[in-house]
Swiss-Prot record:
InterPro entries: Ribosomal_uL18_bac-type (IPR004389), Ribosomal_uL18_bac/euk (IPR005484)
Coiled coil: none
Assembly and oligomerization: Part of the 50S ribosomal subunit; part of the 5S rRNA/L5/L18/L25 subcomplex. Contacts the 5S and 23S rRNAs.
Family under the similarity heading: Belongs to the universal ribosomal protein uL18 family.
Pfam families recorded: Ribosomal_L18p (PF00861)
GO biological process annotation, one example: translation
Protein name listed in UniProt: Large ribosomal subunit protein uL18
C-alpha cells in the first residue's frame, strides 16, 4: 500500500462517520503548491463555500502559495464565506492529511474567523 492509498483510506473512514452524523463538512485538500478548502452540504452534493490559493485574491496577498501564511488566509476566507451563508458549525474533514502544519494553520484561522468545530 502506498502513501496516497493509505491517505485515501483514512479519509474515507472519517467521511463515512461525518455523513452518518449529517454534518456540514469543512474539507481540506493539500498539494505541495496549493491548499484548497470547501464547505460541503450534509448530503455531499453541494459546495456551500470555497477558497483556495489558486484564487487571484489570495495570490496577490502572498509571495508563495504553498506555505502556512497562505493556508491561514484560505482558512480565514472560507470561514468568512461560510458565515455569510449562515453556516457556523462544521465538521473538519482533513482528507486523511495529518493535523499538522498547513492543515492545522488553516483550521486555526477558520476557528478564529468564527467557524465552530
Amino acid at each position: 500500500m502506498d502513501k496516497k492509498v493509505a491517505r485515501i483510506r483514512r479519509a474515507s473512514r472519517a467521511r463515512h462517520l461525518m455523513r452518518e452524523q449529517g454534518a456540514t463538512r469543512l474539507v481540506v485538500h493539500r498539494t505541495p503548491r496549493h491548499i484548497y478548502a470547501q464547505v460541503i452540504a450534509p448530503n455531499g452534493s453541494e459546495v456551500l463555500a470555497a477558497a483556495s490559493t489558486v484564487e487571484k485574491v489570495i495570490k496577490e496577498q502572498v509571495q508563495y502559495t504553498g506555505n502556512k501564511d497562505a493556508a491561514a488566509i484560505v482558512g480565514k476566507l472560507v470561514a468568512e464565506r461560510a458565515l455569510a451563508k449562515g453556516i457556523q458549525v462544521v465538521a473538519f474533514d482533513r482528507s486523511g492529511f495529518k493535523y499538522h502544519g498547513r492543515v492545522q494553520v488553516l483550521a486555526d484561522a477558520a476557528r478564529e474567523a468564527g467557524l465552530q468545530f
